[in-house]
Amino acid sequence: MFVRTAGERDLDAIRAVLVETWHATYDAIYGAAKVTEITDEWHSIASLKARLIKPNSDFLVADDGKRIGGVAFAESIDGGKLVVLRQLYVLPSLQGRGIGGMLLDEIIESFPEAQAIRLEVEAQNTRAIAFYEANGFVRSGDTGERTGTFGEPTLVYRRPLAG
């Protein structure tokens, strides 16, 4: 797999990665119907297309030349000092092979002036939490409000960068 910038031709494959990964991660916890409702809204082609042109952001895919195996999207805020990782997903069948780390490294390299990277993660997504902690993220709090994907507080993680 190699990491590259996502393009409009990738949108169907990106959506497929997101839908499959979300169902694999959340169906047992929240139910397939709720997950489908969310992926239909958040991962629609129109929503994904808007991310391609969002200023101060980077949208990446992990590609082996035959298929998209992972996606990542992040944007900088606070004058470029902070990167917010909005999405990092790898197909379940490809997890544990370093693809997530490759995507994360490339996201960080895309924002050389950033001093930190921040993300929010569902408290029940223990696999993602373990991944982020193994990659230097430290829990810095939670949203404190029922704003998460499923109406629950999300955990906030942060990692300092060289900047």
Residue ranges and their predicted role:
Residues 12, 65-66, 127, 137:
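Intrinsic disorder/low-complexity detector
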Residues 99-111, 116-117, 124, 128:
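A structural feature recognizing the 12-helix transmembrane core of secondary solute carriers
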